[in-house]
């Protein structure tokens, strides 16, 4: 968890994910991301889901949205990206690698604010029942029922799709640490980002899947 500004460590509750609910239906899948503080009216932050289709620790699909402006469903400022060349995660998925040049993260844009193969693919809104959360709805066919790992994230720092995974872009020293007792405290290059561990759907995990929630 790094929902803090760089160097001065100012906490940002609008980036701090408390929990996430995912409900998969025959037509639509719904995700609700709950934050520590009220969802802002506007801002540069992004929220979303990362999907690992083959449970190897590498994200395959990235769903992201800007701050929803209304409790009405909208496709505005919503994107879906895909990693076609499998470089997300670097050499060791879900672990810190030495900074690697040439990684391109999520390089393929599948959906952008209603533009794409299916203009109805993904919708978002502010949660009308909870000011500290947002809702994402996407067609279940985007991923299917074959089983996958998923996690949620919030970002108001690097905001760089081509830099995923962030932990493969910086040394531990340059990234810094959020823990006051650490010799590399405070947070430096890797800031204002929060992610969850990975939950599963559609299969029984062995317990060895990278990033799996305990």
Where are these regions (language model features)?
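Surface-exposed extracytoplasmic segments
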Residues: 1-214
């Amino acid at each position: 968890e790094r929902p803090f500004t760089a160097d001065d460590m100012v906490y940002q509750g609008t980036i701090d994910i408390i929990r996430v609910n995912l409900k998969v239906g025959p037509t639509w899948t719904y995700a609700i991301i709950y934050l520590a503080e009220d969802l802002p009216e506007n801002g540069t932050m992004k929220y979303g889901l990362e999907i690992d289709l083959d449970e190897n620790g590498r994200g395959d699909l990235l769903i992201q949205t800007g701050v929803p402006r209304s409790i009405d469903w909208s496709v505005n400022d919503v994107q879906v990206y895909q990693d076609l060349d499998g470089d997300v995660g670097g050499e060791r998925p879900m672990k810190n690698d030495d900074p690697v040049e040439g990684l391109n993260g999520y390089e393929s844009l599948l959906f952008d604010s209603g533009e794409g193969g299916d203009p109805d693919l993904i919708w978002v809104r502010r949660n009308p029942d909870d000011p500290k959360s947002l809702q994402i709805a996407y067609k279940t066919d985007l991923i299917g029922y074959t089983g996958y790992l998923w996690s949620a994230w919030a970002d108001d720092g690097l905001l760089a799709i081509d830099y995923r995974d962030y932990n493969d872009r910086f040394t531990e020293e340059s990234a810094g640490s959020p823990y006051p007792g650490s010799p590399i405290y405070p947070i430096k290059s890797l800031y204002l980002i929060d992610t969850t561990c990975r939950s599963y759907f559609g299969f029984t995990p062995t317990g060895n899947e990278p990033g799996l929630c305990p």
